[in-house]
From Swiss-Prot:
Keywords: Viral release from host cell, Viral tail assembly, Virion. Gene3D superfamilies: Apolipoprotein. Coiled coil: none annotated. One of its GO terms (biological process) is viral tail assembly. This is Probable tape measure protein. The keyword Manganese does not apply. Its main location: virion. It is found in: Virion. It comes from Lactococcus phage SK1 (Lactococcus lactis bacteriophage SK1). InterPro entries: Tape_meas_N (IPR013491). The lineage of its organism: Viruses, Duplodnaviria, Heunggongvirae, Uroviricota, Caudoviricetes.
Amino acid sequence: MASNATFEVEIYGNTTKFENSLKGVNTAMSGLRGEAKNLRDALKLDPTNTDKMAQLQKNLQTQLGLSRDKATKLKQELSSVDKSSPAGQKKWLQLTRDLGTAETQANRLEGEIKQVEGAISSGSWDIDAKMDTKGVNSGIDGMKSRFSGLREIAVGVFRQIGSSAVSAVGNGLKGWVSDAMDTQKAMISLQNTLKFKGNGQDFDYVSKSMQTLAKDTNANTEDTLKLSTTFIGLGDSAKTAVGKTEALVKANQAFGGTGEQLKGVVQAYGQMSASGKVSAENINQLTDNNTALGSALKSTVMEMNPALKQYGSFASASEKGAISVEMLDKAMQKLGGAGGGAVTTIGDAWDSFNETLSLALLPTLDALTPIISSIIDKMAGWGESAGKALDSIVKYVKELWGALEKNGALSSLSKIWDGLKSTFGSVLSIIGQLIESFAGIDSKTGESAGSVENVSKTIANLAKGLADVIKKIADFAKKFSESKGAIDTLKTSLVALTAGFVAFKIGSGIITAISAFKKLQTAIQAGTGVMGAFNAVMAINPFVALGIAIAAIVAGLVYFFTQTETGKKAWASFVDFLKSAWDGIVSFFSGIGQWFADIWNGAVDGAKGIWQGLVDWFSGIVQGVQNIWNGITTFFTTLWTTVVTGIQTAWAGVTGFFTGLWDGIVNVVTTVFTTISSLVTGAYNWFVTTFQPLISFYKSIFGLVGSVINLAFQLILAIIRGAYQLVIGAWNGISGFFGVIFNAVSSVVSTVFSAIGSFAGSAWNVLVGVWNAVAGFFGGIFNAVKGVVSSAFSAIGSFASSAWGVVSSIWSAVSGFFSGIFNAVRSVVSGVFSALGGFASNAWGAITGIFSGVADFFSGVFDGAKNIVSGVFEAFGNFASNAWNAITGVFNGIGSFFSDIFGGVKNTIDSVLGGVTDTINNIKGSIDWVASKVGGLFKGSMVVGLTDVNLSSSGYGLSTNSVSSDNRTYNTFNVQGGAGQDVSNLARAIRREFELGRA
């Protein structure tokens, strides 16, 4: 079933650039409106979000700018439109409507922007669902003022609308009639084929099945009938042919094929069925028309026939002739059964509507066919009689023409011929439109116009025989009158066929008729005497076949009305009659206008009532569906809440059980490690307490050794100081007198110092020996201590290793225990969720199978389910987190335990080494103490006089020297500073040098 709609595209001027510009604006506006909608929805959920309000305000301002730009462009384009042509008028209307829409939209956007500004100021999105109609009303007023300009083009617009409507209806009617005629031919072919095969009784079954198939799908009845006829002609039964055709048509539509593509598919499949073989050419033709169907057919044939796999592909198998038409038929049956073939798109529905109308016209066409055929046969007889009569007419007119040339009648005729042609053409145009409205005989008007030209040529050859001509015409009129019954039957049938469509042409016909009659009135008033004869002849018969006879009558009557007094008077009275008749015509058509207005108003009121009834009916249906849906949503919401609550309760019990179990395990492990830590800490404290007296013992030994060494050094120092004082005293007593004796004393002193050196060396060796003995003694002690510490740490390491092995074995047992539990829990939970998933899947499948529009509801439901499941897994995550924290706590306890152990070892070593250090410091302090005591026994100064430098004579140097009762030596120096030097500062510096031992 093919679509018969015809689309006419009128292009006015070069508007490509302008239309592309508007298209870009419309695209941008569409995107902005979508964004604004999302922002409004977001503000409903978060009414205090001022950022969203600012974004919406910016969006609306952008829309307002685009609307104003669009209005400006429309005004510019509107100013350049030429309203004198139908295309210009059509474009002017379109642009005016678009301009009004753009300005109304701009006013609405201004109101919305003010609302958003108020919301931003208040900080809350509380917009009332009201529209500011102030701007809209002004826009409507502007539209009213613009539409006042429609008066100047109203007539042209309505003419264009009427012409377009008549054209559309005419095209649709022609298409439906054409489809009905094609279907009639296909049915005749099917009927003849069935009769030839001896199955004429199956005609009703096959034809009705094909009509039903065409109405239910996007196929054409003609195509389905042809295909089923092909199958029947090849020997299939009526039932088999119907099944094959249904499978092919439904498969084509199921795989996206249209009614036009079905023609190519049917042609290719029919050729393969007729030839009895599957050719690559026909398969490619089928695939070209419906690629998806061709691919599916090939794959299905290969799947249903495993033996074809040896050829590798469908193409190879078809080239080898391994694929039969029977294989194709079975595969097509499978594809058709899977597809269903129901009407699925708007285009398919429209094709189905066209096919339904075509089939509705079929009974009328069948009834008209014998009547029209009979009339055509009779008209053929009339034409033969008229042809014989014309021979004598031509002969007579030739004689008449000669007489007219002689008396000057032709000169008068030539002057008025131009007016006659114009009038004749207008009247014939009216006749042509009327004939087209009732019978669709478009070609007759053109033939009539051509006949006028033929008449003008024939008049030059007209001659005599006016009486015979009139007699022949009367005979012809009598013949035509005798056939009045057949003509009435034809007219009644045609009116019954087209009654539903003539109304669309009445407006155009009235306008054209008024124009034509106005031209006719002008021609009559101009004195064209041919009109009376023309009307008289037209009252007899409108058919073009009488053109030559009419011309002859006109020629004879022209002479009568222009050359005789009687004719002139008759013509004057006829003109008066036409004037009164014209007034009646004008009144008649004026009344028709009011009549059509009343009919139209009644039709509009009736349509409004019907529409309101439909609206109320659909509103009731919608309300009923809403009530049913609310009940369904309430039921499933309650059901889901119950299920979720049960799951939450069960899961809370599971998590509570495992949380308590895990806390118990953590407490046990923590207690074990606390016990181990306490044990090791006690051992360490015992070790430190045990070795503390030993350290004190070492310290006392070192203190004793230090004291001995310090005492020895103090004795040596005392001897040296005593000897030194003796030498100084002797030197002071005899220095002035016994210079020679000094060398002897020097040798004595040298000997003494040698002895002292020997003594000091011997003393040092003794000290070294003592020290070595002490070091050996303490080395043995430290080696013993090191062995004890090493043994202690080895024991601690063994103990910790054993303890760790025990802990590991305990943990392995615990982890194995919990692994089994968790595996069991995982299986249980997996089973529960699998059951829930199966339940949800089945419930969802059933619900979507019944209600395809509940996506929003179940979206919310499953969002809730998602949150619940998320909460469940969050609880599971908390449980796992607690377990992990407990495990890490245990291991942190282990780390702290070993940290304490090694910290204790470090502290032990620090204590031991610290004891050694303190011992050495104590020994040093003891020696220093003994040395200070020995030094206190031998007071005095080690400063000696410089005998070889006499400073007394110059007033510098040592001035006095004395020894006090406590054996202290006091030396008095006379110090003078150089130029610019402070003596006090110089004395302080010298004293500081003495105190530091550097002088």
